[in-house]
Amino acid sequence: MNIFKRIKAEIVYSLAVRNADNAHSENGERYYVMPSEDGRLVVVDRRNFSILKRKNYIPKDASVADMQRECFYCTPYRNGKGEMPADIIALKHSAFLDWFAKR
């Protein structure tokens, strides 16, 4: 990946993480940064995940565990537990960069 694509990828990732953190600070829900089929990042919580499943935007057999496994970032739970460790965040960030380079 050249430097300009890398800079764009870092900006896209940081904006998605900031949007997830802002949404979490508003109501305390856990938010996930997920890839979409059109090559963008979406910030989704569990409630919207189930709505998207109901409308068949997401396969019916997808679960919250799948969402946690495939997300690039997630906020902690309302009580503060479940925060992603720094090494997992770095691993997910590198997975995002690989995904961004392939799209």
Task: Go through each PLM region and give its residues.
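Acidic/polar low-complexity segments and flexible, solvent-exposed patches
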Residues: 2-103
